[in-house]
Amino acid sequence: MKQYWERLRELREDRDLKQADIATLLGTTQQVYSRYENGKNEMPVHHIITLCKFYMVSADYILGIE
């Protein structure tokens, strides 16, 4: 099963977006977002909600809940 940060990377790359683009959307820096996407830091729930809306996917999908 994929980790949520792997799904976030796939969603971003599928849309040809850079980490800096998503960091701006979330109101954070590229460095902080990179740590989320690499699994080094836990992503806050409010960021996950924002990304669900942006990517038009469910939290279940991002979190790998089936």
Regions found by a protein language model. Give the residues of each.
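A short, Lys/Arg-rich alpha-helix, primarily the initiator
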Residues: 1-14
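Residues that mark the N-terminal boundary/hinge immediately upstream of a DNA-recognition element
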Residues: 7, 18, 44-47, 58
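Histidine kinase transmitter module recognition
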Residues: 14-15, 54
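Short alpha-helical DNA-recognition segment
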Residues: 16-35, 50
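DNA major-groove recognition helix of helix-turn-helix/homeodomain DNA-binding modules
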Residues: 27, 46-61
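DNA major-groove recognition helix of helix-turn-helix
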Residues: 37, 55, 66
